[in-house]
């Protein structure tokens, strides 16, 4: 935020997405966004509170800053969707009037035995039109997106300590071996090896 008398003020944030570079939200964002505040009038009250909180030493300061940055990120994403400035991926798919219904179904009930036909029906499109539109807008096939979304959930549940047997059922896989095959195809490692790697990465990142 800038002031002609006092100059510019900066607040920096580091946002970590689950799955790192494989996160569908992170993949859809442009590498750099520079916007004047005049284009985001709804952000001004939130940013004013954010800057005040950043410069204060109040109780609960970090929790407040985390939540305020989340609000700013959501407002920024909405603005980018309106401008059509996002890359092919989750955000452009959610902005599509028909594809968003299929994406919402995948997100809400990933364990369902989704097929191109059933997803196309939710989108109100024919199978072929849906498959082509999905690939063009989201940047991958419906089956590819479904698997990546499921594996992202599997990674989250592994970190939470859930047993692989329950994870397989919740993620829509018929068995642990079926999940392990899909996981290795996506991540290059077995679920167990991936978890060990992530735990070591977390230890290495500690100061």
Predicted regions span which residues?
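An amphipathic alpha-helical interaction segment
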Residues: 18-20, 38-107
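Conserved A-loop
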Residues: 158
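Basic/polar phosphate-binding segments, predominantly the helix-turn-helix DNA-binding elements
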Residues: 75-81, 101, 105-149, 162, ...
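N-terminal regulatory/effector-sensing and dimerization cores
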Residues: 1-32
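PLP-dependent class I/II
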Residues: 200-201
């Amino acid at each position: 935020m800038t002031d002609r008398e006092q100059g510019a003020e900066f607040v920096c944030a580091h946002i970590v997405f689950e799955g790192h570079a494989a996160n569908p939200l992170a993949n859809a964002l442009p590498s750099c966004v520079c916007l004047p505040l005049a284009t985001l009038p709804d952000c001004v009250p939130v940013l004013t509170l954010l800057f005040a909180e950043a410069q204060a030493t109040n109780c609960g300061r970090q929790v407040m800053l985390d939540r305020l940055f989340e609000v700013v990120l959501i407002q920024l994403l909405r603005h980018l969707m309106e401008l059509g400035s996002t890359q092919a991926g989750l955000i452009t798919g959610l902005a599509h009037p028909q594809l968003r219904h299929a994406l919402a179904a995948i997100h809400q009930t990933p364990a369902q035995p989704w097929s191109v036909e059933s997803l196309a029906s939710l989108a109100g499109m024919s199978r072929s039109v849906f498959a082509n539109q999905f690939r063009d807008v989201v940047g991958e096939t419906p089956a590819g997106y479904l698997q990546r979304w499921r594996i992202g959930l599997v990674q989250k549940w592994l970190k939470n300590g859930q047993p692989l047997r329950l994870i397989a059922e919740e993620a829509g896989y018929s068995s642990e071996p079926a999940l392990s095959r899909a996981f290795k195809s996506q991540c290059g490692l077995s679920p167990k090896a991936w978890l060990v790697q992530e735990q070591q990465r977390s230890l290495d990142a500690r100061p």
